[in-house]
Amino acid sequence: MAEDATLVDETALEAAAGESPPSNATACGELAPSPLLRGKWLKDDMPRERLLRQGPGVLSDTEMIVLILGSGLPGHDVFSVARELLDRFGSLRAMLDATYTDFDGLRGIGPAKKAQLLAIMEMARRSLVDKLRSRSLLNSPEAVENYLRLRIGGRPLEVFVSLFLDARHRLIHCEESAQGTLTRMAVYPREIVRRALSLNAASLIVAHNHPSGAVQPSASDCRLTHTLRDALTLIDVQLVDHLVVGVDSVYSFARAGWP
């Protein structure tokens, strides 16, 4: 679309996006009618202009992606590309877990657009980790849970994450200690113990996701938790918590009394 044009054809945008053109969206994604002028859009109602005037909270998820992409490719309008991205992943949060190959087959997403999206998503993840490093995680359980939901809550396969903490419960290092399938995963406590020693960690928070979304721990989750807790006790490292992570909720072994 031509940036210098004062008016943008509304019908063309609707056909390209498969939805109503960007409007006065709220942060919750609810749309309010856009000011129209004889079936056309004023330039002031385009996503970039509205963001600069009112802030990012007024934009829909589709419009945010439009601004990140900047433009489409020949034959692929940027609004339709943004909508297809959301349809593929289901939400912006799920996009944060995407890999390079997850974007394969999407119309209008070439190598440059893939790299751009992945770089922005990595910046978001690193920003969250930096926030965790600046505080005692023992006093910030919500921050830990929000980060883990964002990092692994939407993953299609099971992932086991270890957060190694210092004596003041500040984050030293976070890593994925194991990856599995849709329903099972092999975690080796001795490897986590070895890693804790190498990082000189004083305590540890571990977490894994349930791709099904149900966060109730299994019998094997409980066995692993107690085995790992006992192994860490032998080297004087505290297991602060084991979290089972879903897209929208988290189960805490510590809050549940270590069943």
Swiss-Prot record:
It comes from Paraburkholderia phytofirmans (strain DSM 17436 / LMG 22146 / PsJN). PANTHER family: DNA REPAIR PROTEIN RADC, UPF0758 PROTEIN YEES-RELATED. It comes from the Bacteria. One of its GO terms (molecular function) is metallopeptidase activity. Coiled coil: none annotated. Signal peptide: none annotated. SUPFAM superfamilies: RuvA domain 2-like. Belongs to the UPF0758 family. This is UPF0758 protein Bphyt_3148. It holds the Pfam family RadC. A motif (JAMM motif) lies at residues 208-221. Keywords: Hydrolase, Metal-binding, Metalloprotease, Protease, Zinc. Zn(2+) binds at residues 208, 210, 221. Residues 137-259 form the MPN domain. GO terms for biological process: proteolysis.
